[in-house]
Swiss-Prot record:
This is Thiol peroxidase. GO terms for molecular function: thioredoxin-dependent peroxiredoxin activity. Keywords: Antioxidant, Oxidoreductase, Peroxidase. Belongs to the peroxiredoxin family. Tpx subfamily. Disulfide bonds: none annotated. It is an enzyme of class 1 (oxidoreductase). On the 2D-gel the determined pI of this protein is: 4.6, its MW is: 20.2 kDa. The lineage of its organism: Bacteria, Bacillati, Bacillota, Clostridia, Eubacteriales. The keyword Oxidoreductase applies. It catalyses: a hydroperoxide + [thioredoxin]-dithiol = an alcohol + [thioredoxin]-disulfide + H2O. It comes from Clostridium pasteurianum. Thiol-specific peroxidase that catalyzes the reduction of hydrogen peroxide and organic hydroperoxides to water and alcohols, respectively. Plays a role in cell protection against oxidative stress by detoxifying peroxides.
Amino acid sequence: MKVTFQGNEVTLQGKEVKVG
């Protein structure tokens, strides 16, 4: 999971999600 939070990206479980 790629999560964007305050301009930062986190990859988790190979999926992509955008937050904020």
